[in-house]
Amino acid sequence: MIKKQLQAVSNAYKALKNSFVLGKTSDELFEVFQKTLDKELGDYEMVYDYIWGIDTLNIDGVTKNYIPKEGDTLIMDISVKKDGFWCDVCRSFFVGAPTDEQRKVFEMIKQSLREGQKALKAGGKACDIYKKVNTMYELNGKTLVHHAGHKIGWEPLMQPQFLQGNQTPLVVGELYTIESGLYEKFGIRLENNFLLTEDGAIDLFEDLMPLKIEEYVLR
């Protein structure tokens, strides 16, 4: 249902990365991203967060007319609708070599997605995913400050949201996101989409955009 959207978003992320040079503005870079989606999808809808540098501490929004600099992070949280269905994924990028601290945070967030996937299973509840994801934060003295994902489908954000105390059952056959981010000295967020089956959650985006930090360095 969302394979076409995910492939197009993956290609658009890669086009932005490949076009990056210091001195280009955030607007110029986003134009590359959007033109790739236009070419691949034609008629589609999109909502997004596109935030650079200090703006990543705001969690959401759009950074306009900004010239990226070494040490910045970029959060691109992208929801795309095609043929009646929405995907909702997020990747974070680094301008120049990531610092040791940025690497540590990226790996923590990546692992929290892996833990959340274990809880996304038949018979589970929405709160189970938040608990699993947030456990990785607690181990590092942190807290996940927003939901840990939600259902997607004919809307980009549907109920249930994965929040503490949400007892809504998970439903086999539905599409869900797992979403995790930390926003302190810099912001980093990652989000993948999953199909829930009787045998567990199938990650629909990992093969397209593996979570290897070196793949997200802008040089």
Q: What are these language model-derived features?
A:
Residues 1-219:
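Active-site neighborhoods and metal-handling regions in enzymes and metal-associated proteins
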